[in-house]
Amino acid sequence: MKTSIATVSINGTLKEKIHAIARAGFDGVEIFENDFLTNNLSPKEVKKLVKDHGLEITLFQPFRDFEGMPDQHRKRAFDRAKKKFEIMEELDTNLILICSNTSNISLGGIDRAANDFYELGEIAKERSIKVGYEALAWGKYINDHRDAWEIVRRANHENVGIILDSFHTLSKKIDLNSISSIPAEKIFIVQLADAPSHNMDLLYWSRHFRNMPGQGDLPISDFMNALDRTGYDGYLSLEIFNDSYRSGPREQIAKDGKKSLVS
């Protein structure tokens, strides 16, 4: 499988991160929106930077608080999506990560969310963009990949799929057999992260204590075995939120990350 890493996983400017990621031998890079917004390069310049380093942009993320918004906020959610699609076209990437809604004003309902994703899929299709939906472990209504998959299944759109993140699944001890039943073609990308065992708020645990696969206590190998049973052969991408990584030597951390995916 090809390997990728999110820019949020290491420190430095966007240029420095891209350089370190390429030197470590990754095939692709997830562009984290904050890294994009805080750099002084245009989208087309970022596109050139990535390609000049022999990488491809595996996805653009995150897009928050999209699905299930009340009517008076729904149009704005779609307008925000369209603006992100415009940026993605300039970056030359075709996958956006939409994480499950955490807004207090969002509404529940599998069918409501599925309808939102079908409509967004139609807009994305016009631009040859794919929409990947990820269940955050702390999402207001959707906090389990099984529910995210049900939304994707009901949306029934070729441009809408699921994004699996090992932390969100394993931190909640969700039955891994539920992964094996997802069609490989509907898994748009897989993000990997391990973590030490902690009894703490899921959001805080995720934002500060993730680490490389094999360096924590989560059953990553079991997750990978379940993934293998789907026949998935797309990107494996690291998404590591860790305070020490964000202040440590980026080139070494990038190399360690690459090693964790191929060992």
Predicted features along the sequence, with ranges:
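Short, conserved active-site loops that position catalytic residues or coordinate cofactors/metal ions
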Residues: 24-33, 59-65, 100
